[in-house]
Swiss-Prot record:
Tissues showing expression: Expressed at low levels in the shoot apical meristem (SAM), leaves, ears and roots (including root tips).
Assembly, per entry: Component of the origin recognition complex (ORC) composed of at least ORC1, ORC2, ORC3, ORC4, ORC5 and ORC6. ORC is regulated in a cell-cycle and development dependent manner. It is sequentially assembled at the exit from anaphase of mitosis and disassembled as cells enter S phase.
Induction (free text): Reduced expression upon sucrose depletion-mediated cell proliferation arrest, and accumulates after sucrose treatment.
Family: Belongs to the ORC3 family.
Full protein name: Origin of replication complex subunit 3
Places the protein is found: Nucleus
Region (Disordered): 26-75
Keyword Transport appears in the UniProt entry: no
Residue spans crossing the bilayer: none
Length: 718
């Protein structure tokens, strides 16, 4: 970070330092200060832990120097930052493993269908003819019948907006088929392009099957390999994950070539289709389509996968990390308006998790949610906190009503334990809402966004079945309306599922059982009405309507009492990410402002010892581009190059002027070598390079021919 010394000559050709923009969410602290209590002015208490074991056993507070305190604070900073980083890795690892299990569980049904289809197709091909190994090795097809030249092909409709969500699915499908006794080969859209041709495509297929690919890649090499005893009784499955992006001519030529050998070499296709099942008809010719024997399979819709993911990672407390109402609404809008992919939603959630652990000083306590003895874990961690962080914990906005600070440690542990218990009941009630909303095609993500709204929790609100609560309960009210029109059989099944979700909530479970018994009696009355229609009355219909209203009123009452948002609970800031502005700027992006902010506050990211002591002042030890960006803040939309250079020259030469004015030190101290002042040509070269880097990053527009002495600023707003 220091300016290059004068004893080594510098030129732009020999010393071009790389230009780094290190962004670590520095703007997060300032933007989140409005929602969290401010820490001591040193700014270091938010990353301190108990390091009493590192201190001297007999400290003398009267003789400790400031340098020793600063060194100890630096060590505390690194230890505490490492603790939060470890907590993030552990929490996100749990979330990621849950995501993988959910997606694989959804895909297993499709995998079983594909495997069953492969086995049936292989049996059908073998029933036509079973050539011997010698016949397979013969360099010509075995049969010429048209019926025997059709390749069994499974078209898998994924319904995804982007192919990025299909990558994991087809990768797992290939592993699943290979583990169940199939020879596997994967062909990408790049290999099936006009640029590569069918020869490159077939060579790629051979490389995945044969251990030694001959120089001349032809179908006879594949036939010779398949005639071996260890390969003969297993089908060959070729997976093409993105059919729409392939070249129709290349794929058609491959189909025509392999179809001639389908009896000798049982090769089957599995092709992924993202749009509609008419895609093969648009891509391949009629002659090519006649060589395929299609089978249509469908993967679960993106909405089903999204509902399963939201239930596993946001509704159920799987890792101790949650998001606020504003963040949930932003993620939902980002999913629907950006590209509609599960991958983008997961990436945004991971970014929110990382921002939470980088901003919140006490976020490392989230790990306690994963511990079996979580209360002892929280007690130990709280006892290790310094006094500043204890005050910070008791001063959280959600805890400002707590008057007693003498037992703040117990209050925090009890508060986090109560938060977990309330969240468990919250998730149970939310799942009951979703089970009822399925009959009205209500998505779980929409209900979730309403359930995390802190304004929704009105425990003493009037419980009127026909009264709407406003737009904040739009989807929840839609669920209530759906319940009122459900038939008795569906209502009984719904109550059965509710009793499973509400396990552990005894009072609510008893009410559900009462409604179940009422449902059974109502159903028996309906059967009696069907047997003796003349003796029945209209009271049966009225009782059914009353029963539906009772179920809706029960769910509405449970919702108002137990659907408590996490933002209404004490200490929720520790586990809940609320700063949507950070997430919005990171995902939607404002790159010029972020680059400018990183340059102006470079010392916060680089953490060098020379610039850290005076973080506000512009020092010569800073990078030239950072110095120039700081000086540019003093100008308007245009900057005079001459004035800018004079300011830059003054900063650079301030080091040498301080050395000249430095008083003589004691003779006992070792004399340092004098630092020679830099030449004006070198300062001009450094100035020009810094201006060029600011132009490359998009912060400046270079001088025009009319005003060559002025440059124009592009980025503002700091």
């Amino acid at each position: 970070m220091a300016a290059p010394p004068g004893e080594a000559p510098l030129t732009a050709a020999t010393n071009i330092e790389p230009f780094y923009v290190l962004h670590k969410g520095g703007a997060a602290a300032s933007s989140s200060s409005s929602s969290a209590p401010s820490l001591p002015s040193s700014g270091r208490a938010r990353r301190r832990i108990d390091v009493s074991g590192l201190a001297s056993p007999n400290p003398k507070p009267g003789k400790r120097s400031r340098d020793d305190d600063a060194a100890e604070d630096d060590d505390d900073d690194e230890l505490y930052e490492r603790l939060r980083l470890d907590a993030f890795h552990r929490v996100w690892s749990k979330i990621q493993s849950t995501i993988n299990e959910v997606l694989r569980g959804i895909s297993l049904k499709l995998f079983d269908q594909v495997l069953r289809w492969v086995q049936e197709s292989f049996s059908a091909v073998r029933s036509i003819a079973r050539p011997s190994a010698a016949e397979v090795r013969q360099p010509y097809p075995l049969l010429t019948d048209v019926i025997c030249r059709k390749i069994p092909t499974a078209f898998v409709l994924t319904k995804n907006a982007e192919f990025v969500d299909d990558i994991t699915t087809f990768r797992d499908l290939a592993e699943y088929l290979e583990s169940n006794g199939c020879h596997l080969a994967k062909l990408s859209a790049t290999e099936l392009s006009e640029k590569n041709g069918v020869g490159c495509c077939f060579r790629s297929l051979l490389r995945q099957l044969l251990s030694d690919v001959p120089d001349v890649a032809d179908i006879f090499a594949l036939a010779s390999w398949y005639s071996a005893a260890e390969n003969y009784d297993q089908p060959i499955v070729v997976v093409i994950d993105d059919l729409e992006q392939c070249s129709g001519d290349v794929l058609g030529e491959l189909v025509m070539m392999l179809s001639e050998w389908v009896i000798k070499i049982p090769i089957f296709f599995v092709m992924g289709i993202a749009t509609t099942l008419d895609a093969p008809r648009k891509l391949l010719s009629s002659e090519d389509l006649q060589r395929l024997e299609p089978c249509k399979l469908t993967l679960g819709s993106p909405s089903d996968r999204m509902n399963a993911l939201v239930e596993a990672i946001l509704v159920k407390p799987c890792a101790g990390f949650c998001i606020s109402h504003e963040v949930a609404v932003f993620l939902r809008n980002y999913f629907f308006k950006h590209d509609g992919t599960i991958t983008s939603f997961i990436s945004a959630l991971k970014l929110a998790c990382s921002k939470h652990f980088s901003v919140e000083p006490l976020s490392f306590l989230c790990m306690g949610m994963l511990e079996e003895d979580r209360e002892n874990f929280w007690h130990d961690k709280f006892n290790a906190l310094p006094q500043e962080l204890r005050k910070y914990a008791s001063g959280l906005p959600s805890c400002t009503r707590e008057k007693d600070s003498t037992k703040s440690g117990d209050n925090m542990v009890d508060g986090l334990s109560e938060l977990m218990n309330i969240q468990k009941d919250w998730s149970s009630v939310l799942l009951c809402l979703y089970e009822a909303g399925k009959h009205g095609k209500v998505q779980l993500l929409d209900i979730f966004c309403e359930a995390v709204n802190p304004d929704l929790h009105t425990q003493k609100a009037p419980n009127l079945p026909n009264e709407k609560s406003g737009t904040s309960r739009r989807f929840i009210d839609q669920v209530m309306d759906t319940i009122r029109y459900l038939p008795v059989e569906t209502l009984f099944c719904l109550l059965e599922v509710w009793s499973i979700h509400l396990n552990g909530m005894d009072k609510i479970t008893n009410k559900v059982k009462e409604l179940q018994s009422t449902t059974i009696s109502t159903d028996s009355v309906r059967i009696t009405k069907d047997k003796w229609p003349r003796r029945s009355t209209n009271s049966t219909g009225n009782s059914t309507v009353a029963l539906n209203d009772k179920v809706a009123m029960l769910l509405d009452d449970v919702t108002r009492k137990f659907l408590v948002s996490v933002e209404c609970l004490p200490f929720h800031e520790i586990v809940c990410f609320k700063n949507v502005s950070i997430l919005q700027s990171a995902l939607i992006g404002n790159p010029r402002r972020m680059v400018q902010l990183d340059l102006v506050k470079s010392h916060k990211h680089l953490k060098c010892s020379c610039c850290r002591k005076n973080g506000i002042a512009v020092l010569a030890s800073m990078h030239d581009t950072s110095i120039m960006c700081n000086l540019a803040q003093e100008y308007g939309d245009v900057i005079n190059l001459h004035d800018w250079y004079i300011s830059f020259d003054g900063i650079i030469n301030s080091v040498h002027s301080k050395i000249k004015r430095k008083p003589h030190t004691s003779p006992s101290k070792k004399k340092s070598k004098p630092v020679a002042a830099e030449s004006e040509a070198m300062i001009q070269a450094r100035f020009c390079r810094a201006v060029t880097e600011l132009q490359i990053t998009g912060l400046l527009r270079m001088p025009s021919k009319r005003r060559p002495d002025l440059v124009q600023r592009i980025a503002f707003g700091l």
